[in-house]
From Swiss-Prot:
Signal peptide: none annotated. Transmembrane segments: none annotated. NAD(+) binds at S18, G19, N20, I21, S167, A168, G169, P170, G171, T172, R173, A174, N175, N297. Coiled coil: none annotated. This is Acetaldehyde dehydrogenase 1. Keywords: Aromatic hydrocarbons catabolism, NAD, Oxidoreductase. Belongs to the acetaldehyde dehydrogenase family. It is an enzyme of class 1 (oxidoreductase). Its EC number is 1.2.1.10. The active site is at C136. InterPro entries: Acetaldehyde_dehydrogenase, Acetylaldehyde_DH_C, NAD(P)-bd_dom_sf, Semialdehyde_DH_NAD-bd.
């Protein structure tokens, strides 16, 4: 289908899911995007705050889910749909949208399409009908794994994502198992680690703490030149993520130490190597567009999805112009 743009030249999109993530994404599009225009907000609870806020902001809404979206007059002009529902609901949403030629950006752990982490592999998947934004923990940590792997192979990577309990809505809590499985898989497929593991911690502390992530990478070289190159690569990657998530930062300097002889992780390193452990501590503060600043886990997810949506829209518009 031809790219549908508004009178301002923006590509029209819809958001399915009127919870925390969907609502924050809607507001980001409204306030910050020079490329996208939100044409519809979709939920299943007519009284949800997300739909109520959308109505106040003059965004067309439906509380009848995907079926309601397909019946909306605005649907004909929508080119890209962001799905912020759940892994279970996404399969049907994707089937119906793909059959109608819409591109889908999946913010659930369903992972029907390829995993996408913008600074690592977005451009490689711009032709995919469905792309998956992994998880909040994945968006925060996989760029670091990829940065280390760009210098020297990562034999094992483990990430620990600690988020404020208050920032985890019912969707996040219902998908905890999918979170760990999806993130671990993407650590390998996108980050490049030979083996990956993910752990999520819901921190009940009051007042709520911002998102904090720890990334451990086991590498097969501990010489100074490799260490210096790893630190430089990680620093560059942090700067790239900060382009679209300003609250993303290194909490401490990158730490690299030789793996001791009795370290159980040493057996995962290549035979004959002098393995080292790279440890990176991250902190993510949210932009507070809709959610509190401590909800950096949600902010990095919606910011990554927005980045992907804008890049996809630009690509579609360029191709349309080239064939006009």
């Amino acid at each position: 289908m031809a790219t549908a743009t508004s009178g301002t030249g923006k590509t029209k999109v819809a958001v399915i899911g009127s919870g925390n993530i969907g609502t924050d994404l809607m507001i980001k599009i409204l306030r910050t995007s020079e490329v996208l225009e939100i044409a519809a907000m979709v939920g299943i609870d007519a009284e949800s705050d997300g739909l109520a806020r959308a109505r106040r902001l003059k965004v067309a809404t439906t509380h009848e889910g995907i079926d309601g979206l397909l019946r909306m007059p605005e649907f004909d002009d929508i080119e890209i749909v962001f799905d912020a529902t759940s892994a279970g609901a996404h399969a049907r949403n994707d089937e119906l949208l793909r059959a109608r030629g819409r591109r889908v950006i999946d913010l659930t752990p369903a992972a029907i399409g390829p995993y996408v982490v913008p600074p690592v592999n977005l451009d490689a998947h711009l032709d995919a009908p469905n792309i998956n934004m992994v998880t909040c923990g994945g968006q925060a940590t996989i760029p670091i794994v990829a940065a280390v792997n760009a210098v020297t192979p990562v034999a094992y990577a483990e990430i620990v994502a600690s988020i404020a309990s208050k920032s985890a809505g019912p969707g996040t809590r219902a998908n905890i198992d999918e979170f760990t499985e999806t993130t671990a898989s993407a650590i390998e497929k996108v980050g490049g680690a030979a083996r990956g593991k993910a752990i999520i911690v819901l921190n009940p502390a009051e007042p709520p703490l911002v998102m904090r992530d720890t990334v451990y990478c086991l590498i097969g070289a501990s010489d100074q030149a490799t260490q210096d190159a790893v630190v430089a690569s990680v620093t560059r990657m942090v700067d790239r993520v900060r382009e679209y998530v300003p609250g993303y930062r290194l909490k401490q300097q990158v730490q690299i130490e030789e793996a001791s002889a009795d370290d159980p992780l040493r057996q995962l390193a290549p035979d004959g190597s002098e393995p080292a452990k790279v440890t990176v501590f991250l902190e993510v503060t949210g932009a507070a567009h809709y959610l509190p600043a401590y909800a950096g886990n949600l902010d990095i997810m919606t910011s990554a999805a927005l980045r992907a949506g804008e890049r996809l829209a630009q690509t579609l518009t360029q191709r349309e112009g080239a064939t006009a």
